[in-house]
């Protein structure tokens, strides 16, 4: 066989099916759109589900893709074996009610034997036990040797998940060994031994399984195929595993270069190198597709992969930041197929660098605590770390659970995962209660998401805010209805509408619907899972009925304010690019009638000067009264025109481009003002960080901007009145008062110091001796932490061989400090252990070194008991 690189294989596959009249689609982003069942795209057909289910019309009945995928179900095995990986590409060709078995089977054989040139005596085919149709096609429409076709049962060659669409499949296998297998038993044995490997699965979706277990023929039969690019690359390159194929090996070589390690010389180092290679590739693609490191959902998947790779870099001796440099190797090997990698390379590197820096801080502090836990376990001969301690590491110090487990495993220890999960569940419940979460009408089981796929609503609301239409569907959260009466809430679909449905960060319209029989207010307009325009309504008079003519009226004033904020968002995006640089890209947005919120990629808080420049530029462009123009064009035309596209969006072939004069040009389906002058005024309200490398600006426009400035002005007037000065002198007056307060604080500190001066002699009068070690304890009043430490240090200096423990009730809070002479440590004295027990008595916590420790508490009434506890602990330590 001729050697073929992974990039060549990808192109050959897609070109082959283009020659069979398939539409080639670019890979969908790794972040699923409108699919709550998936965290990340994990299969080639996953983003095409709406086409298979009939919820959406495919752009063509024949489609081919190379879909990037992430699977983390067996992440613990990645690196430990050379077979597992988190990132992979799935080649696929799909038919939505077009061709079926008689076409795909000979095409598949043609591709692998003629295009790829795989020898026929190296191939085997499996079919479902009873699929005679597939057998007949294989034997009549291809020249496969019938003795190389094996029939297998449901577990191997039938695809189904519960009830719903399902069907048999045929799989194509490659034989890495010599000689022919003659029987099914020999075939299965060779497969289990990895001599024979499956590399292409053709699924024939021809049945609909009902609740009773009956298989009914589907009127529209579909084809869904999947071939792992990495798997076929191992075959075409004659290698045993994914880390040896050309593209992945190049990235592995980069990992070796950055860590100064050689692959193939040490098993443990090989594990670390494979983890860095695989995870480095995955995090590059995840960040490119808009995922940000976080502690939830897909953001946590990213953080986990990145931190696991960073730790294995440390195991290989890397001291500083290095993972961001892996990006270049990924871009070099995948950039032609995925040009967005090239465009976002600098941004990806910066996000990785920020996260790795943060992790290095986390791991340094967390590792010390974990190692102290492990030391305690070893002292007590314990083998299981408590779930509460692991949760504290995770929740308080940001130390990853998986890292805790991995380190414990390396030391032959275990984690009480059950109690960790219990702690996590309780925390989430507290957070949920704090947020006051509630479900929104329209779960996936609701009738609103079961509307007939053939129903189409024409949106005619860019210009028209009022039109007549016909009710085609009525319902509530429980069922479809023929009529909704006064006081009832539900949903309504019409054949056309002026109501904008929430999308692209813009909220849905509100307004009212009237008919001959009644009136309803529209509280919201959204799209259901099938993309249908759904009006959420409350009937306030009479009733609305299915099939009747209605008049739909959008709240014009509210829409106008939304338009101002949406157009201003586009202008803000462009202004940020001009002031900060081209690395700025939209990461999220929200637009309603009161304000706008814009999240964007940037690596530091904006300075006051930068914010002023951005705000001024937007207002200057508003005052040009530029025409806001909208045009429909092909996606390629839009890109060539310089229109801004969002990386995590999947666009149709025809797109809508919104231009604000010659200043801003973006792909957008939202509603906008007719000219920039309608916005009136733009005012930034706040700028903040929302995640690593993501900033957020909130702003207001028009009347809301004027009201905001009026509020600010009133606040200035009130402040000037309270400070008894002119508005222009407020800053000077505050600075002067701050200086006065600082001087007063200094005086207070000096007075407190005088109060405790010489107190050490009084404190030493209560000294006791325990087994040759001196113990001094004392309770003080209104002494702050700094003064308490100074006093303890002075007392310690007057001891020959001993420990001092001081406690102070400082405004209802307890300050504790313990200090010991160095020679007392040899007698068993340990301040950290003493202070830990003492702090518990006053409802606090703390710790420290053997020679010095401090803590706080909240129950000053227990100070006397706490100091008694100090004596008990010292007696135990110096026996």
UniProtKB/Swiss-Prot annotation:
Has the keyword Aminoacyl-tRNA synthetase been applied to this entry? yes
| Family membership | Belongs to the class-II aminoacyl-tRNA synthetase family.
- Check the record and name the Gene3D superfamilies matching this protein: 2.40.30.130, 3.10.310.40, 3.30.54.20, 6.10.250.550, Bira Bifunctional Protein, Domain 2 (3.30.930.10), Threonyl-trna Synthetase, Chain A, domain 2 (3.30.980.10)
Function, in words:
Catalyzes the attachment of alanine to tRNA(Ala) in a two-step reaction: alanine is first activated by ATP to form Ala-AMP and then transferred to the acceptor end of tRNA(Ala). Also edits incorrectly charged Ser-tRNA(Ala) and Gly-tRNA(Ala) via its editing domain.
On whether Protein biosynthesis is a keyword of this UniProt record, the answer is yes
Note the InterPro entries from the entry.
aa-tRNA-synth_II/BPL/LPL (IPR045864), Ala-tRNA-lgiase_IIc (IPR002318), Ala-tRNA-ligase_IIc_anticod-bd (IPR018162), Ala-tRNA-synth_IIc_core (IPR018165), Ala-tRNA-synth_IIc_N (IPR018164), Ala-tRNA_ligase (IPR050058), Ala_tRNA_ligase_euk/bac (IPR023033), DHHA1_dom (IPR003156)
Q: Where does Zn(2+) bind?
A: 566, 570, 668, 672
Cofactor(s) listed: Zn(2+)
- Keywords, ordered alphabetically: Aminoacyl-tRNA synthetase, ATP-binding, Cytoplasm, Ligase, Metal-binding, Nucleotide-binding, Protein biosynthesis, RNA-binding, tRNA-binding, Zinc
Tell me the name of the encoding gene.
alaS
- GO BP, one example? alanyl-tRNA aminoacylation
What detail does the entry give on cofactor binding?
A: Binds 1 zinc ion per subunit.
Domains as described in the record: Consists of three domains; the N-terminal catalytic domain, the editing domain and the C-terminal C-Ala domain. The editing domain removes incorrectly charged amino acids, while the C-Ala domain, along with tRNA(Ala), serves as a bridge to cooperatively bring together the editing and aminoacylation centers thus stimulating deacylation of misacylated tRNAs.
Q: Which reaction does it catalyse?
A: tRNA(Ala) + L-alanine + ATP = L-alanyl-tRNA(Ala) + AMP + diphosphate
Entry GO CC: cytosol
What is the protein's given name?
Answer: Alanine--tRNA ligase
Q: What is its EC number?
A: 6.1.1.7
Q: Where in the cell is it found?
A: Cytoplasm
């Amino acid at each position: 066989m001729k050697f073929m690189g992974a990039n060549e294989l990808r192109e050959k596959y897609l070109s082959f099916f283009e020659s069979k009249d398939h539409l080639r689609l670019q890979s969908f982003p790794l972040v699923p759109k409108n699919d709550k069942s998936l965290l990340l795209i994990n299969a080639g057909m996953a983003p095409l589900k709406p086409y298979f289910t009939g919820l959406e019309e495919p752009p063509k009945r024949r489609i081919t893709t190379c879909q990037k995928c992430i699977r983390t179900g067996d992440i613990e095995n990645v690196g430990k074996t050379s077979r597992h990986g988190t990132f992979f590409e799935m080649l696929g060709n799909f038919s939505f009610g077009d061709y079926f078995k008689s076409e795909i089977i000979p095409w598949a054989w043609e591709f692998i034997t003629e295009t790829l040139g795989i020898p026929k005596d190296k191939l085997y085919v499996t079919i479902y036990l009873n699929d005679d149709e597939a057998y007949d096609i294989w034997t009549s429409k291809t020249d496969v040797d019938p003795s190389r076709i094996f029939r297998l049962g449901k577990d191997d060659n039938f695809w189904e998940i519960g009830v719903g669409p399902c069907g048999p499949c045929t799989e194509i296998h490659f034989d890495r060994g010599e000689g022919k297998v003659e029987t099914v038993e020999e075939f299965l044995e060779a497969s289990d031994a990895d001599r024979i490997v499956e590399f292409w699965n053709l699924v024939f979706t021809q049945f609909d399984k009902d609740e009773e277990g009956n298989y009914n023929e589907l009127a529209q039969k579909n084809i869904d195929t999947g071939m792992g690019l990495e798997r076929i690359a191992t075959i075409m390159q004659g290698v045993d595993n994914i880390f040896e194929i050309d593209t992945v090996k190049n990235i592995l070589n980069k990992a070796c270069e950055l860590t100064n390690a050689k692959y193939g010389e040490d098993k443990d180092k090989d594990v670390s190198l494979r983890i860095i290679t695989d995870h480095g590739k995955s995090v590059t693609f995840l960040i490119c597709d808009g995922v940000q490191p976080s502690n939830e959902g897909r953001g946590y998947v990213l953080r986990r992969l990145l931190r696991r790779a960073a730790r294995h870099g440390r195991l290989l001796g890397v001291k500083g930041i290095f993972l961001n440099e892996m990006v270049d190797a990924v871009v070099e090997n995948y950039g032609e197929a995925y040009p967005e990698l090239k465009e976002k390379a600098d941004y990806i590197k910066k996000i990785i660098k920020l996260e790795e820096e943060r992790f290095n801080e986390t791991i340094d502090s967390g590792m010390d605590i974990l190692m102290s836990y492990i030391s305690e376990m070893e002292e007590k001969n314990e083998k299981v770390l408590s779930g509460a301690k692991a949760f504290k590491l995770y929740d308080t110090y940001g130390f990853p659970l998986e890292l805790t487990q991995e380190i414990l495993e390396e030391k032959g220890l275990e984690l009480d995962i059950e109690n960790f999960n219990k702690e996590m569940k309780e925390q989430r419940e507290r957070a949920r209660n704090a947020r006051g979460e509630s479900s929104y009408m329209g779960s996936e089981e609701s009738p609103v998401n079961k509307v007939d796929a053939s129903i189409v609503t024409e949106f005619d609301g860019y210009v028209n805010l009022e039109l007549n239409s016909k009710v085609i569907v009525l319902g509530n959260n429980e069922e479809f209805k023929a009529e909704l009466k006064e006081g009832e809430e539900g949903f309504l679909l019409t054949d056309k509408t002026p109501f904008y449905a929430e999308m692209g960060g813009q909220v849905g319209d509100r307004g009212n619907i009237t008919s001959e029989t009644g009136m309803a207010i529209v509280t919201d307009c959204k799209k259901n899972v099938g993309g249908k325009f759904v009006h959420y309504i409350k009937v306030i008079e009479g009733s609305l009925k299915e099939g009747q003519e209605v008049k739909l009226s959008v709240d014009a004033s509210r829409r106008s304010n939304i338009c101002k904020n949406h157009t201003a968002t586009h202008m803000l995006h462009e202004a940020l690019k001009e002031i900060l640089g081209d690395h700025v890209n939209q990461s999220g947005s929200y637009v309603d009638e009161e304000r706008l919120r814009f999240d964007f990629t940037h690596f530091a808080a904006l300075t006051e000067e930068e914010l002023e420049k951005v705000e001024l530029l937007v207002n200057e462009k508003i005052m040009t009264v530029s025409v806001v123009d909208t045009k429909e064009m092909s996606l390629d035309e839009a890109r060539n025109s310089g229109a801004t596209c969002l990386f995590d969006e999947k666009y149709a072939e025809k797109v809508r481009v919104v231009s604000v004069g010659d200043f801003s040009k973006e792909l957008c389906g939202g509603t906008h003002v007719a000219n920039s002058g309608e916005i009136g005024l733009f005012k930034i309200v706040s700028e903040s960080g929302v995640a690593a490398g993501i900033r957020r600006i909130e702003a207001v426009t028009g009347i809301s901007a004027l009201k905001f400035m009026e509020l600010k002005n009133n606040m200035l007037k009130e402040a000037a009145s309270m400070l008894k000065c002119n508005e222009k002198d407020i800053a000077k007056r505050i600075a002067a008062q701050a200086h006065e307060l600082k001087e007063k604080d200094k005086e207070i500190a000096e007075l407190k110091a005088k109060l405790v001066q010489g107190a050490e002699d009084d404190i030493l009068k209560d000294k006791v001796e325990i087994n040759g070690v001196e113990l001094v304890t004392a309770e003080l009043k209104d002494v702050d932490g700094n003064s308490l430490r100074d006093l303890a240090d002075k007392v310690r200096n007057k001891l020959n061989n001993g420990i001092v423990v001081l406690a102070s009730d400082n405004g209802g809070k307890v300050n504790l400090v313990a200090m010991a002479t160095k020679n007392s440590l040899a007698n068993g004295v340990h301040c950290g252990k003493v202070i830990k027990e003492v702090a518990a008595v006053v409802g606090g916590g703390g710790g420290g070194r053997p020679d010095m420790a401090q803590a706080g508490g909240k129950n000053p009434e227990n100070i006397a008991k706490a100091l008694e506890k100090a004596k008990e602990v010292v007696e135990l330590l110096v026996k």
